[in-house]
């Protein structure tokens, strides 16, 4: 079994180099990997972080969420398009950092509710 630590306990910007000492400490404590919150996708920054995590010997997975500005199930086509574009950047950031897994929820924005019950097609 492998044991990892979710970095959301400390930060929502894991690519910030100020957190490198924390990552080294987690490795020294015996953690096999870390789970990265990717809320501000930036493949270039995450590629740099990936190289640093390789040097530390830490494996990585990632998580993200959608918000109202990039809700994949919004009735507004421009918001759905923004969701698609953002999720592409998240996936690119995962690839750049060397993440083996991306978790969500990815299907809808956090905290967005229509207030309507399920339709017959949804039920």
Role assignments for model-derived ranges:
Residues 77-123:
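Active-site acidic/histidine proton-transfer and metal-coordination neighborhood
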Residues 4-14, 19-23:
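Short, Lys/Arg-rich amphipathic segments at extreme N-termini
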Residues 21-28, 43-64, 89-99:
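Acidic (Asp/Glu)-rich catalytic clusters
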Residues 6-8, 33-35, 74-76, 119-120:
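A short, structure-level motif marking secondary-structure boundaries and short turns
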Residues 1-4, 53:
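N-terminal amphipathic alpha-helix/helix-capping segment at the start of soluble metabolic enzymes
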Residues 11-17, 36-48, 71-73, 110-114:
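Acidic-and-aromatic substrate-binding clefts and catalytic sites of carbohydrate-active enzymes
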Residues 3-7, 32-36, 60-65, 102-104:
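Hydrophobic faces of well-ordered beta-strands that scaffold small-molecule active sites
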């Amino acid at each position: 079994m492998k044991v990892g630590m979710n970095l959301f306990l400390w930060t929502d910007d894991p690519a910030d180099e100020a957190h490198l000492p924390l990552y080294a400490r987690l490795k020294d404590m015996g953690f096999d990997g870390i789970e990265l919150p990717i809320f501000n996708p930036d493949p270039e920054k995450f590629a740099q972080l990936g190289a640093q995590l390789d040097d530390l010997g830490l494996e990585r997975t990632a998580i993200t969420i959608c918000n109202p500005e990039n809700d994949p199930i919004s009735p507004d086509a421009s918001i759905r398009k923004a969701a698609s574009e953002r999720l592409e950047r998240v996936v690119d950031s995962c690839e750049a950092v060397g993440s083996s897994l991306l978790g969500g929820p990815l299907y809808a924005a956090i905290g967005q509710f229509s207030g309507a019950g399920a339709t017959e097609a949804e039920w």
